[in-house]
């Protein structure tokens, strides 16, 4: 368990440091800023790279909503759920702390939104609580469907991190203007702790919605994605002679 715990810590650290770091330092850098597109790709690349790096050790969750969804789907033991979530939150908080120290090392730097997630007046596009709730549930549900589908035994081995990384990129392209994109309670927690105030007050939504979405995605996958007991749906059957 210690190797898995460390892997989840490192993977979530890299996700927050790379994804939120790109938003904090590079998104609006004068003349050369990477914008929403660059931030979206940064988040996708963090998951892709760490899934290959440590996914073979821990499964590469890096996200409490993913761990909950996989548990609901019967793909992850419930006994390991709390240790995984603890490792993920710790990784996110340590990454946020590192970003904070780096940011405040610049003369005249202001923490601002610090890539925290929010709704209402703290949504990048001014979207309501209901909008934030719906988009986080829907996108996390589809994220779990992609994860469960791409890691299924009938899919060629080795391509899952690519599909999952691209899915997370797409998720960010859709929802950065709405909530700054969470779909990951650990990622939201790390940033909120250093912003304080409104970010902590709104943090509940970025635990509730992704976890609910993850569970929904898992149930949807179990209904249509799993092979039937009597046979292998979608598999090639030998020709009769």
Swiss-Prot record:
GO terms for molecular function: water channel activity. Keywords: Cell inner membrane, Cell membrane, Membrane, Repeat, Transmembrane, Transmembrane helix, Transport. InterPro entries: Aquaporin-like (IPR023271), Aquaporin_transptr (IPR034294), Aquaporin_Z (IPR023743), MIP (IPR000425), MIP_CS (IPR022357). The chain crosses the membrane at residues 23-43, 85-105, 129-149, 156-176, 204-224. The record marks 43, 172, 181, 187 as: Selectivity filter. It catalyses: H2O(in) = H2O(out). A motif (NPA 2) lies at residues 184-186. It is a multi-pass membrane protein. PROSITE patterns: MIP. The record marks 20 as: Involved in tetramerization or stability of the tetramer. It comes from the Bacteria. One of its GO terms (cellular component) is plasma membrane. A motif (NPA 1) lies at residues 63-65. It is found in: Cell inner membrane. Belongs to the MIP/aquaporin (TC 1.A.8) family. Channel that permits osmotically driven movement of water in both directions. It is involved in the osmoregulation and in the maintenance of cell turgor during volume expansion in rapidly growing cells. It mediates rapid entry or exit of water in response to abrupt changes in osmolarity. Homotetramer. Aquaporins contain two tandem repeats each containing three membrane-spanning domains and a pore-forming loop with the signature motif Asn-Pro-Ala (NPA). This is Aquaporin Z 1. It comes from Agrobacterium fabrum (strain C58 / ATCC 33970).
């Amino acid at each position: 368990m210690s190797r898995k715990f460390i892997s989840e810590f490192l993977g979530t650290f890299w996700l927050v440091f790379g994804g939120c770091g790109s938003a904090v330092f590079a998104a609006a850098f004068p003349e050369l800023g990477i914008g929403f597109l660059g931030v979206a790709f940064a988040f996708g690349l963090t998951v892709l790279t760490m899934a290959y790096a440590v996914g073979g050790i821990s499964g590469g969750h890096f996200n409490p909503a993913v761990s909950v969804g996989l548990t609901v789907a019967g793909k992850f033991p419930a006994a390991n759920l709390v240790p995984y979530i603890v490792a993920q939150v710790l990784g996110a908080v340590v990454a946020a702390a590192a970003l904070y120290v780096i940011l405040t090392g610049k003369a005249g730097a202001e923490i601002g939104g610090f890539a925290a997630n929010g709704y209402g007046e703290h949504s990048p596009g001014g979207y309501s609580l209901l909008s934030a709730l719906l988009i986080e549930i829907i996108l996390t549900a589809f994220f779990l469907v992609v994860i469960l589908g791409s890691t299924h035994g009938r899919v060629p081995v080795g391509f899952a991190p690519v599909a999952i990384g691209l899915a997370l990129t797409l998720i960010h392209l859709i929802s950065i203007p709405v909530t700054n994109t969470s779909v990951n309670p650990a990622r939201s927690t790390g940033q909120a702790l250093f912003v304080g105030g409104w970010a902590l007050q709104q943090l509940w939504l970025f635990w509730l919605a992704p976890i609910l979405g993850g569970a929904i995605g898992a149930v949807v996958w179990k209904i249509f994605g799993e092979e039937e007991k009597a046979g292998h749906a979608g598999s090639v059957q030998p020709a009769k002679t």
